Curated annotation (Swiss-Prot):
EC identifiers of the protein: 3.1.1.29
Composition bias, Acidic residues: 173-190
Compositional bias of kind Polar residues: 44-53
Protein name: Probable peptidyl-tRNA hydrolase 2
Matches recorded under PANTHER family: PEPTIDYL-TRNA HYDROLASE 2 (PTHR12649), PEPTIDYL-TRNA HYDROLASE 2, MITOCHONDRIAL (PTHR12649:SF11)
Organism the protein comes from: Caenorhabditis elegans
Length: 316
């Protein structure tokens, strides 16, 4: 038995399918109109500006503006006060200060020092020494450095004052006519002298660091100072007793730093006033330093005496 199958039109099954000769442009729809979309949403439509409808800007050039010449007319004269005229004339009449007057602020000229009483000039140490006094000191055998230093410290008061200043700060043996008069006393044995019980002694040697001596040079000068102090102490009975006590307690020796030749000479006087034995070495000048330089000061005595002189100095 055969069934009758009805004929089916393909176009009825696919009504939206495009035909064979249908325009394919419908598959690519055009871009949506943004203006219509903004109108639906309530958004304002931006206005387009072209070259033709652009608004004209104001002309900002100043070429058409007139410029007045400030120097075209007459300049008005400004009256000058009479006080200014008097000041200018006085300034022209005053002398111009010389460089020597203005190079050192606060220092008045010689003619102004006597007339100015409200602001007196402080006394200053003279920079130059009296050449006549210096020549006398050199004739007496003092070296130039010591002579100049003595004249400065005594304000060039005179030769006697300078000599006294040097003597107070030097070895007594430097001015003795016969420095070997105590050689027989030095031959005595130290063990034969009884020391004072309970006394502790020490020796301090002050090196002059301003001379820039080497290590070996300082060691040699310290040896000279130690021997010099020892000889000075052995010249008296009290010194021999002190040396004996010092020997029994280990012969304490301490080397400290001195700042300058002037400090060593001042310490020499302080040691003399304190009752210590002292010796200031003057180098012969064969190596490193000039002849006559004060290199090392040796001080010997009781602990209390020596500490009162060199207690503030630092160890070398």
């Amino acid at each position: 038995m055969s069934e009758n199958i009805p004929d089916i039109d393909p176009n009825e099954l696919l009504p939206n399918a495009p035909g064979q000769h249908q325009d394919l442009g419908v598959d690519n729809p055009p871009e949506p109109d943004n203006a219509s979309i903004r109108a639906e949403r309530g958004s304002p439509t931006p206005s387009s500006v072209t070259v033709d409808n652009a608004p004209s800007l104001p002309d900002r050039s100043f070429s058409h503006l007139p410029i007045n010449d400030p120097f075209s007319g007459e300049i008005p004269e400004v009256p000058i006060p009479s006080s200014a005229i008097s000041i200018s004339s006085q300034a022209l009449s005053d002398p111009v200060p010389t460089p020597s007057d203005t190079s050192r602020p606060g220092i008045l000229r010689n003619d102004e020092q006597g007339s100015t009483s409200s602001h007196p000039v402080d006394p200053q140490e003279p920079n130059e020494v009296n050449n006549e006094y210096l020549a006398h000191l050199l004739d007496l055998g003092f070296d130039e450095y010591t002579a100049v230093l003595a004249l400065k410290r005594t304000n060039s008061a005179g030769v006697e004052q300078a000599v006294a200043w040097i003597v107070e700060r030097s070895n007594e043996s430097d001015f003795d006519e016969d420095s070997s008069s105590s050689e027989n006393e030095a031959d005595e044995e130290m063990g034969a002298v009884q020391s004072v019980a309970g006394r502790t002694h020490k020796m301090v040697l002050v090196a002059n660091m301003s001379l820039k001596m080497g290590t070996g040079k300082i060691a040699a000068q310290v040896g000279h100072a130690t021997l010099g102090v020892y000889r000075q102490a052995m010249n008296s009975e009290n010194g021999q007793n002190a040396i004996a006590a010092w020997t029994r307690h280990g012969q304490v020796k301490i080397v400290v730093k001195g700042q300058s030749t002037e400090q060593l000479m001042d310490l020499c006087k302080v040691a003399k006033d304190a009752g210590c034995y002292y010796y200031l070495v003057q180098d012969a000048g064969y190596t490193q330093i000039p002849a006559g330089s004060r290199t090392v000061l040796g001080i010997f005595g009781t602990v209390e005496q020596v500490d009162s002189v060199t207690g503030g100095l630092k160890l070398l």
